[in-house]
Swiss-Prot record:
Catalyzed reactions: an NDP-alpha-D-glucose + D-fructose = a ribonucleoside 5'-diphosphate + sucrose + H(+)
GO biological process, one term: sucrose metabolic process
Function: Sucrose-cleaving enzyme that provides UDP-glucose and fructose for various metabolic pathways.
Protein name per Swiss-Prot or TrEMBL: Sucrose synthase
The EC number(s) this enzyme carries: 2.4.1.13
Keywords: Glycosyltransferase, Transferase
Region called GT-B glycosyltransferase, residue ranges: 275-752
A GO term for molecular function: sucrose synthase activity
Upper lineage: Eukaryota, Viridiplantae, Streptophyta, Embryophyta, Tracheophyta
Alphabetical list of InterPro entries matching this protein: Glyco_trans_1 (IPR001296), Sucrose_synth_GT-B1 (IPR000368), Sucrose_synthase_pln/cyn (IPR012820), SUS_EPBD (IPR056736), SUS_N (IPR056735)
Superkingdom of this protein's organism: Eukaryota
Family from the record: Belongs to the glycosyltransferase 1 family. Plant sucrose synthase subfamily.
Keyword Acyltransferase: no
Pfam families in alphabetical order: Glycos_transf_1, GT-B_Sucrose_synth, SUS_EPBD, SUS_N
Length: 805
């Protein structure tokens, strides 16, 4: 048999050197074209366009070499003649950096700090400052276990359970943290799980075997109260279960773990320990209320997400507490900002019960300054100078309201996650982070060209807050894989925070690791009481039909609806979102306006913005102006209807179904969408859905089966795809039904709040245990974050102007 020969894997630089040596003229020609763009940043589509434009013979010579591979993996090229630096993404979360001298055709490898320093020259010119603040979290997590496979990203809890069970199997003493963890459980002074009769592992195993033997003699339905006193005498307290059967299951699981730990048993056991009774959910910005707020500035999907999340979470908590054999009423507090100028909403009310719950409330706390309470709405980009006093006040309010510390704090969006970090740090409780959207990815190059953005958006403070929160938190929930690590061709939201620079402030050489096991994908659903299939006739809310028909087809043009639909027999393509640049509603209108085939086939209805009042939001003002211009320029009246934002969620659910009755479709055209709750809502109603391929909807929709993915940067193609669909449906109506049914099936399999709630509480348990066993290891990073907060964030927050009352 031939002897196996090990060959060295050549570095990226070596492979590029080899290609340069073999094809100097062809590569020089290409790089010269890149250099001719002059100083600046070139994105992937620009680089590939230049490559496609070179002569076919020259291109063919490069096709089989490392150069094409590098080019397709390059996320940006920094051009500073004669140098071109490339940021090369080999796979999600794995990057390399090189630069090429176009004149000398020399390739140099760059470290992350060297690449960022080179990039800064776009703004600062050549600088000799060797003392730029560099932020590096890698040393604090180097000893933590992490997966290395791309498929493991977003499955952190599974990896963590495997690691913990392997560690526990190492020797008997490794079980001691589990014993200590079980002994610390109590609620308002009442001991749970184990009492002080059990001091060591030997006693624990002995007691568990005795309990197992006794429980096998009882009927499975025997109530815990029947043997509670007997268990107390041997060291076992309430929390194991409400019946003999459930208690026996728990005791057998623990005995199995003590004998031979495995990851599945560990997760199941930790998930059934009574740990979460009081939950605080932070969402300070916008108009947070249950009615008449959707469509207000900064008030959209996040509010819907939380108001759907909380009833499902409470139901799961009540179910678990009952099954644990406890008589405890859980509490959930949604903490938001109190707005004295509530403009016809309940945002000025301190405490408001959440609909459909027994023990959940919205708790509102005002922003205040030395001059008193701030009365008016403030943009989410301008909340930073108020956060510190707000967090102090929130700490006092939740302690008074709960009469206990929360067991879990969940942050939402940048300022909610910063608040959650500071509160969790102060109270020593488990923290969960939900970003919803990280603005850095929504505004390309807002880091390097910070000066162009900071006066309007104050990204210096926001990006700093994001870094603090994502590194402080115990676990992070995302709705999709793309939110963490993008796709084969696109960079993820969190991934974009791995390395970046804000010239004049600091460089981030290691901001986050997408392989960190704190990341978990837990997708939300839609409220099944509001969003159900159009075909369920007995549940349909036909009472709303006259209002909906008036909304869509009335000949009246006013502040609520502009333009009329002349042909009521056409299907309707429909969209509903906030009217801002990223949501791209005006983009959809432009695609429709410029496609005669689509205009002939269908009507277009857009719900977004509020023409009933003057907007204070600058982006909304700009988008409104653009919408008026499109209507006039393309003579859309007769085929198009622009409806002001609709705040009645119950009626909106029926609106989706009414559009389905017209054999229409829903379109979500955003330039980027972290998840896409409206996509889930539309699909839940059986409405065929076309949604952006930039972000979460690309994971929700299986193209051609449960809907269609569209590229918001290629509007002509998107419009043609829509036209093709409706032409096919005209010939074959079953095609519409097939896509509708495919969407419903997809939602039922993956996107429900029941699945979400079960997963969230299990995560809280596992990471609560992880926090307990690794508390000493986490201390260092938290001290580092304290310093970063005090020395950097506070100063940046103070630079944000206070609102003028």
């Amino acid at each position: 048999m031939a002897e196996r020969v090990l060959t060295r894997v050549h570095s990226l630089r070596e492979r590029l050197d080899a290609t340069l040596a073999a094809h100097r003229n062809e590569i020089l020609l290409f790089l010269s074209r890149i250099e001719s763009h002059g100083k600046g940043i070139l994105k992937p589509h620009q680089l590939l366009a230049e490559f496609e434009s070179i002569h076919k013979e020259d291109k063919d010579k490069l096709n089989d070499h490392a150069f094409e591979e590098v080019l397709k993996s390059t996320q940006e090229a920094i051009v500073l003649p004669p140098w071109v630096a490339l940021a090369i993404r080999l796979r999600p979360g794995v990057w390399e950096y090189v630069r090429v001298n176009v004149n000398a055709l020399i390739v140099e490898e760059l470290t992350v700090p060297e690449f960022l320093q080179f990039k800064e020259e776009l703004v600062n010119g050549t600088s000799n400052d060797n003392f730029v603040l560099e932020l590096d979290f890698e040393p604090f997590t180097a000893s933590f276990p992490k997966p290395t496979l791309t498929k493991s990203i977003g499955n952190g809890v599974e990896f963590l359970n495997r690691h913990l069970s392997a560690k526990m199997f190492h020797d008997k003493e490794s079980m001691t943290p589990l014993l200590e963890f079980l002994r610390v459980h109590h609620y308002k002074g009442k001991t749970m799980m184990l009492n002080d009769r059990i001091q060591n592992l030997y006693t624990l195993q002995k007691v568990l075997r005795k309990a197992e033997e006794y429980l096998t003699t009882l009927s499975p339905e025997t109530s815990y109260s029947a043997f509670e006193h007997k268990f107390q005498e041997i060291g076992l307290e309430r929390g194991w279960g409400d019946t003999a059967e459930r208690v026996l299951e728990m005791i057998c699981m623990l005995l199995d773990l003590l004998e031979a730990p495995d990851s599945c048993t560990l997760e199941k056991f930790l998930g059934r320990i009574p740990m979460v009774f009081n939950v605080v959910i932070l969402s300070p910005h916008g108009y947070f209320a249950q009615e008449n707020v959707l469509g207000y500035p900064d008030t959209g999907g996040q509010v819907v997400y939380i108001l759907d999340q909380v009833p499902a979470l409470e139901r799961e908590m009540l179910k678990r507490i009952k099954e644990q054999g406890l008589d405890i009423k859980p509490r959930i507090l949604i903490v938001t900002r109190l707005l004295p100028d509530a403009v016809g909403t309940t945002c000025g009310q301190r405490l408001e019960k959440v609909f459909g719950t027994e023990h959940s409330h919205i708790l509102r706390v005002p922003f205040r300054t030395e001059k008193g309470i701030v009365r008016k709405w403030i943009s989410r980009f301008e909340v930073w100078p108020y956060m510190e006093t707000f967090i102090e006040d929130v700490g006092k309010e939740i302690t008074a309201e709960l009469q206990a510390k929360p067991d879990l704090i969940i942050g939402n969006y940048s300022e909610g996650n910063l608040a959650a970090s500071l509160l969790a740090h102060k109270l020593g409780v488990t923290q969960c982070t939900i970003a919803h959207a990280l603005e850095k990815t929504k505004y390309p190059d807002s880091d390097i060209y910070l000066n162009k953005f900071d006066e309007k958006y104050h990204f210096s403070a926001q990006f700093t807050a994001d870094l603090i929160a994502m590194n402080h938190t115990d676990f992070i929930i995302t709705s999709t894989f793309q939110e963490i690590a993008g796709s084969k061709d696109t960079v993820g939201q969190y991934e974009s925070h791995m390395a970046f620079t804000m010239p004049g402030l600091y460089r981030v050489v290691h901001g986050i690791d997408v392989f960190d096991p704190k990341f978990n994908i837990v997708s939300p659903g839609a409220d099944v009481n509001l969003y159900f299939p159009y075909s369920e006739k007995e549940k349909r809310l036909t009472t709303f039909h006259p209002e909906i028909e008036d909304l869509l087809f009335s000949d009246v043009e006013n502040e609520e609806h502009l333009c009329v639909l002349k042909d009521r027999n056409k299907p309707i393509i429909f969209t509903m979102a906030r009217l801002d640049r990223v949501k791209n509603l005006t983009g959809l209108v432009e695609w429709y306006a410029k496609n005669p085939r689509l205009r002939e086939l269908v009507n277009l209805v857009v719900v977004g913005g509020d023409r009933r009042k003057e907007s204070k939001d600058l982006e909304e003002q700009a988008e409104m102006k653009k919408m008026y211009e499109l209507i006039k320029t393309h003579n859309l009246n007769g085929q198009f209807r622009w409806i002001s934002s609709q705040m009645n969620r119950v009626r909106n659910g029926e609106l989706y179904r009414y559009i389905a009755d017209t054999r229409g479709a829903f379109v979500q055209p955003a330039f980027y969408e972290a998840f896409g709750l409206t996509v889930v809502e539309a699909m839940s109603c059986g409405l065929p859905t076309f949604a952006t391929n930039q972000g979460g909807p690309a994971e929700i929709i299986v193209h051609g089966k449960s809907g269609f993915q569209i590229d918001p940067y290629h509007g002509e193609q998107a419009a043609d795809l829509l036209a093709d669909f409706f032409e096919k449906c005209k010939v074959d109506p079953s095609h519409w039904e097939a896509i509708s049914e495919g969407g419903l099936k997809r939602i039922q399999e993956k996107y429900t709040w029941q699945i979400y709630s079960d997963r969230l509480l299990t995560l809280a348990a596992v990471y609560g245990f992880w926090k307990h066993v690794s508390k000493l290891d986490r201390l260092e990073i938290r001290r580092y974050l304290e310093m970063f907060y005090a020395l950097k964030f506070r100063k940046l927050a103070q630079l944000v102007p206070l609102a003028v009352e």
